[in-house]
């Protein structure tokens, strides 16, 4: 347990006080989201500098003379600049954004499927590709561990009694739904945030590229115990995953 906590802190895979940036990415989708964010912030800084310069220039020029504005009737060049420049910036930001949106939304040839169902106020998981000894689909419920029952190294409001186990370097499809109200299945390090709506099956995928323990939470206000719906995913080698499946 202490080893897991140490690795999570080293890799920034858990929420931390006063955090100002993303958790470390563990999937290509999350890596793309972080890269898009950094690029957009860079373009916004350029636009901010340009607008600030224009405001400063105008305020200093017209501050020198109360009648200076009378001698400027047209400014076709500046009008062209303030029309063309924002349009080009928007196109530069829009194309990578749309590409990433469609890539994250596309689920192609997954190796396995995990179904997550949100309920007030816990999660229910189903491994539809695997059967237990009785010939039934492997499924279990996951509840938050109360604060007074936490052991050393476990995280308050994040640890659960039964975590999702996934194999590393495997294309996994997550099918998300709800049995009552709208929930949201959110895993920051994996770049997953998808609504769990009753009567609807939403899907997304993840290729988790490193082992570790990842935490998420329900990110849709779903009732008085909304904060008591954490998500915990343990990513292990394929051999360990198969051993875990055999034990279910």
Curated annotation (Swiss-Prot):
Residues 57-87 are mitochondrial matrix. Pfam families: COX2 (PF00116), COX2_TM (PF02790). One of its GO terms (molecular function) is cytochrome-c oxidase activity. The chain crosses the membrane at residues 40-56, 88-104. Its cofactor is Cu cation. Gene3D superfamilies: 1.10.287.90, Cupredoxins - blue copper proteins (2.60.40.420). Cu cation A1 binds at residues 183, 218, 222, 229. Keywords: Copper, Electron transport, Magnesium, Membrane, Metal-binding, Mitochondrion, Mitochondrion inner membrane, Respiratory chain, Translocase, Transmembrane, Transmembrane helix, Transport. Its EC number is 7.1.1.9. It is found in: Mitochondrion inner membrane. It is a multi-pass membrane protein. NCBIfam families: CoxB (TIGR02866). This is Cytochrome c oxidase subunit 2. It comes from Brettanomyces naardenensis (Yeast). The gene is COX2.
């Amino acid at each position: 347990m202490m080893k897991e906590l140490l690795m999570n802190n080293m890799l920034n895979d858990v929420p931390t006080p006063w955090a100002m940036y993303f958790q470390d990415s563990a999937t290509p989708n999350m890596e793309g989201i972080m890269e898009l964010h950094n690029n957009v912030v860079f373009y916004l800084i350029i636009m901010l500098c340009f607008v600030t310069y224009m405001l400063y220039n105008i305020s200093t020029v017209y501050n020198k003379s109360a009648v200076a504005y009378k001698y400027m009737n047209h400014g076709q060049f500046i009008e062209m600049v303030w029309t063309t420049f924002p349009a080009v910036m928007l196109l530069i930001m829009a194309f990578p954004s749309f590409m990433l949106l469609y890539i994250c939304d596309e689920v192609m040839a997954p190796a396995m499927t995990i179904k997550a169902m949100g309920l007030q106020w816990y999660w229910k998981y189903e491994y539809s590709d695997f059967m237990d000894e009785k010939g039934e689909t492997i499924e279990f419920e996951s509840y938050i561990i109360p604060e007074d029952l936490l052991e050393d190294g476990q995280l308050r409001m994040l640890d659960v009694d039964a975590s999702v186990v996934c194999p590393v370097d495997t294309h996994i499809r997550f099918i998300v739904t709800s049995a009552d109200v709208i929930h949201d299945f959110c895993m920051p390090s994996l770049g997953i945030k998808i609504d769990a709506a009753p009567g609807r099956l939403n899907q997304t995928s993840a290729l988790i590229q490193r082992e570790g323990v990842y935490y998420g939470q329900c990110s849709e206000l779903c009732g008085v115990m909304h904060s008591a719906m954490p998500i915990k995913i343990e990513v292990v080698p394929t051999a360990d995953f198969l051993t875990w499946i055999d034990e279910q």
